[in-house]
Amino acid sequence: MLARTIGAAVHGIDAIKVEIEVTVDWGSGFMVIGLPDTAVKESAERVRCAMQQTGFDFPGKKVMVNMTPADIKKEGSAYDLPLAVGILAGDEKINLDRLGRYLLMGELSLDGSLRPIKGALPMAIMARELHLDGFILPRANAMEAAVVNNLKIYGVDNLIEVVQFLNGEIDLTATEVDTRAEFAKAQGVFPYDFADVKGQENVKRAFEVACAGGHNILLVGSPGSGKSMMAKRLPSIMPPLTLSEALETTKIHSVAGKLQQGTTLMTVRPFRSPHHTISPVALVGGGSYPMPGEISLAHNGVLFLDELPEFSRNVLEVMRQPLEDRIISISRAKYSTEYPASFMLVASMNPCPCGYYGHPKKKCVCNEYQRTHYMSKISGPLLDRIDLQIEVQPVDFDQMSSKAPGEPSAAIRQRVIAARMLQERRFKDEPGIHCNAQMTPSLLHKYAEPNAAGLEKLKDAMERMNMSARAYDRILKVARTIADLEGTADVLDHHIMEAIAYRNLDRPTYMGSSL
């Protein structure tokens, strides 16, 4: 007898319908065709044991499974549930009437219980687009999938519940989530606040500019100057996620299996801080079965690279393309996929191997060659893509011991939001452009042209500091953001001067090291 169930395959951060055809006929054996991976082929034993433990007999006949479309790789153990249901339906243990109306996905344990899966959110979106009646999946993923409106989400614990529901023997209660209420609930909740930061007003100002325009930033300073502490507070001054950004961010983390159980929507911008031993594949994504990397997990948030020169040269260089295009393409022999990668890069580093070159109190023990070699680990093209390059000085005792609180993140965030609102209105007719950091050269000419005095100062800096054309564009973008923070329509000379001051590493000789 032929039975059909509906499953899904994740491709990038979207899901594709997979139809699973099962025939149970005379003979013996179990065969799965349709480009399954090893985990899918191994499902026979998991399904057999799960069925036996829940009171069903595995058919003593030939079971043939065909998964279509056949040109898409079927990966993982999440196909256990639709395979088991298809086999039971082919063996006339389940009515066929309701099979084609539900999406089924879930990994089976040997006792017949269901284990969580990856990619439940994009699968639920696909099910709604196909106008299916509902999505039956493990209970642990129900809240995640329930953010999709106009689709019934049935979280179940075991195979028996699914069989009884499809046979009309029991009713399941659909999981419901008020998406907008969930989205609003956790807005503005941050574990770290800039009020805790003593001194460092110039660095806090640079962070404000970076967040207001979506600019990348590099902090250079000795150990203990507060680089990492301030970077961790960055999400607290970034503009809140929009609902569409929250959904897209949650989809990426769903595909990667990074959502905590019971999570509905990610309402705070992600902050990813990979270790410097990370591989290029782990950073940008890929692998035998492509998965999002750290730069995609940081989408709509912050990617913090602490001790930047300690990362391998290959790791740093693979970031150049996604930093420019805000998307990462993974190509394989038979297919390619794309992951979004619109993140704000925040990096920190010491000025030299010992960390104390230029320190007001501690002596550097490095020679000029060591300093030059250390700084040369970061290529010029990568530095060009970092809009703000800030020197972080140690905090003196008077500032550190002061009991006066610093400016709270909430106050800084309000100024950032006001500047972003100006940019949203400015770029409302420009598809794919949301902030100043994303401006194209034509938009720079249109919106960031400085006044005559500013242009003269920029020309002088370009000649004196031997800047590249990309650095020229970055300065104009940052100057436009500074003007937005002031609420001025024109880019003036003092905006240009402040933007140039944020290009520390563009100086011909920085801290004794030629770059």
Each language-model region and where it sits:
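Walker A/P-loop
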Residues: 219-260, 325
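Walker B catalytic acidic pair
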Residues: 300, 306-307, 318
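Basic, amphipathic alpha-helical bundle interface domains used for macromolecular binding and assembly
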Residues: 33, 39-44, 59, 66-76, ...
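Short loop/turn elements that form and flank the Walker-type P-loop nucleotide-binding site
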Residues: 26, 58-61, 98-99, 131, ...
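Short beta-strand elements
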Residues: 18-24, 283, 387-390
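P-loop NTPase nucleotide-binding/switch module
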Residues: 170-209, 213, 240-295
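Peripheral, non-AAA+ core regions of ATP-driven protein-machinery
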Residues: 1-218, 222-225, 471-472, 489-515
